[in-house]
Every structure is written in C-alpha cells, then in structure tokens.
C-alpha cells in the first residue's frame, strides 16, 4: 500500500506540473530525457547475455554448485593483489591520466601535494570514499587507503569527481556550479578506464592482467561493491 501511494503521488505531481509522465519528471532531476532512459534499458537488454556469461564464469572460478548475489562480492583474484604506497599510486594515476592533457595532470599533481585528500584509515572515520565540492576553496576527497588495486582505482575515481568539481567551480558561478549524478559518474569512470588501460598496457604478468581486468569489470557490473560516490 505504501508503494502504491508513492506511485499515485508521483503520478499526481507529474500531472499537476504538466509532465507527460512521472518518468519524465523523474529523469529531469538528472537533466536527462525519457529517450535517454529508454535507450539505456534497451542497450542493457540487448547485451545482457554478456553479464550472464560473466556470472557463469565467476561461478566456475569460485567452484560453486550455485551462485547467489552474496557470492558476487567475492574476489577470486585476491591472491594476486599487491600493496602499493600511496605516493606510487598517485604517480601511477598521473601517468595514466596523461591523455587528459598537461593542464589537467599538473592541477591533479598540485591537488595531491596540497592536502585535498584525507587518505588513510583512522578511528571512527566513515568507510568508503567520497568527494565533497566546496565552492570558492577546492574539493575535499575522503579515502580509506590500504594499498590494494581497488584503492588505487579509487584514487583515480574520486579525483575524477574532484577535478570535475574544480573545473566546474572555476568556470561557473555559485548558483550554477553543481552537476547531476549522471554527469558526475562520466568524469570518474573515464579516469578509471584510463588507469585500467595504462596498467594493462604496462603489465607483463598474465595473472596480474586478469586481476586488473576483473577489477575493471566489478566497477561496471557490480556497482554495489562501491558504497560511495
């Protein structure tokens, strides 16, 4: 009944405000259109077989008779993970993001050297990772860095958000500098892809390449592995 009332409320508000549907009103929050939404669903459905193949392969790797949602969070390649000092991780990210241009890389290096990031675990600190834009100052990035491949990727991801915020603040006034979640995740995902490609291109060990490919996959196909933005 609660769900039904929510649907009725959304439908009524959409009608009162002259939207064609409650869906049109909902996607407008991300400055998207119904066409974009429908295209996304259509594309997912057309390629869902790839995800089925991936799930079957993971079941085989984990040697399970059946696979459940809680099994999907298990990393079968943990044994190939390495521990990387944060200074080395930052240098790796800088090299990987070189295609974004000298200005971008130099500003990112400045961010690393100017304490934009609270990187390490500490008592009572919240988990995950996060970027917080602060207009007129600079973005602040929260991490809980332990040196894993996932953490290295998180640096690229969160500073994708941070640099997006920096450039938006630099070029927009205080009323127009914010951006939608849909747009935000493009900036962060591009950084992750560039980092993954750079590491794959510069890796010679087969098992390391497989582990890096898996890391890229879970960021796309298992978004619940991320508990942050």
Where do the language-model regions lie?
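Cation-handling catalytic/transport regions enriched in His/Asp/Glu
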Residues: 1-221, 225
């Amino acid at each position: 009944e609660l769900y039904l009332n929510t649907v009725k409320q959304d439908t009524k508000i959409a009608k009162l405000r002259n939207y064609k549907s409650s869906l049109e009103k909902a996607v407008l929050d991300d400055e998207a259109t119904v066409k974009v939404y429908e295209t996304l669903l259509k594309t997912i459905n057309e390629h869902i077989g790839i995800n089925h193949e991936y799930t079957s392969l993971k079941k085989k790797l984990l040697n399970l008779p059946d696979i459940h949602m809680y099994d999907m969070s298990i990393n079968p390649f943990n044994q190939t993970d390495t521990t990387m000092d944060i200074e080395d991780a930052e240098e790796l990210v800088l090299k990987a993001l070189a295609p974004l241009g000298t200005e971008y890389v130099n500003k990112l290096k400045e961010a690393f050297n100017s304490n934009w990031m609270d990187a390490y675990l500490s008592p009572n600190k919240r988990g995950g990772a996060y970027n917080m834009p602060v207009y007129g100052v600079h973005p602040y990035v929260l991490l809980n860095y332990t040196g894993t491949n996932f953490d290295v990727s998180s640096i690229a991801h969160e500073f994708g958000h941070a640099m997006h915020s920096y450039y938006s603040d630099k070029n927009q006034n205080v009323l127009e500098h914010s951006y939608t979640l849909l747009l935000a995740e493009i900036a962060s995902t591009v950084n992750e892809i560039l980092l993954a490609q750079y590491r794959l291109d510069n890796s010679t060990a087969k098992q390391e390449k497989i582990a890096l490919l898996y890391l890229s996959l879970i960021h796309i196909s298992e978004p619940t592995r991320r508990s942050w933005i």
